Amino acid sequence: MKKFLTLALSALLTMGLLTACGGKTTDKTVDLTAFYNTLAEEYGWAEDAASSGEEDIMMMNLEGDMLESSYPGLADVATKQLIAKAPMISAVVNEIVLAECGTEEDAATAASILQDRVDAQAEGGAWYPESMETWSNAQVVQNGTYVAMIATADHQEEIAEQFKEAASRGTAAAGCVKRRRGEGRRWSSAA
């Protein structure tokens, strides 16, 4: 049975790889709103107190002045989609930014802005030691024109992996790049 399953999976993988070499490319876009809504449902993030559960984290949109004060310059980056969410209570670390930018250069600019936010919060901007620790583990992930900043006390790695998987379906880029605090200003290949 294991041999059959291995053979079947190998055949499917080979067909998938051969199909990818067909020369035709289709632009697929990841619906970042749907992606965020799935995360919100899965992890208990709500925006409406009336329909939220007892354990839900109340989230809000960061727009206008709030967006600019948290991520200076991000509003000036050309984006096709931009979702920026933060908890209503600052002691809770659960900031999520998802963006599809106009170009890979725009995405790199957005990633740099988001990394600046991570660094500032980890170096004391978050005030509380536990919050600063969570921020020090935050990730900025870029895949082609897609970029995300994920700063959560729980589910950090899971969300980053889900984003990388979703973004890879929406871009023809060869691989994701991510940067964690402490890696300086250089990008490293994601494993």
Residue positions per predicted region:
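C-terminal motif of bacterial Sec signal peptides marking the signal peptidase cleavage site
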Residues: 16-20
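Positively charged n-region of N-terminal signal peptides that target proteins for export
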Residues: 1-4, 8
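Short, compositionally biased low-complexity segments enriched in polar/charged residues
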Residues: 54-93, 105, 135
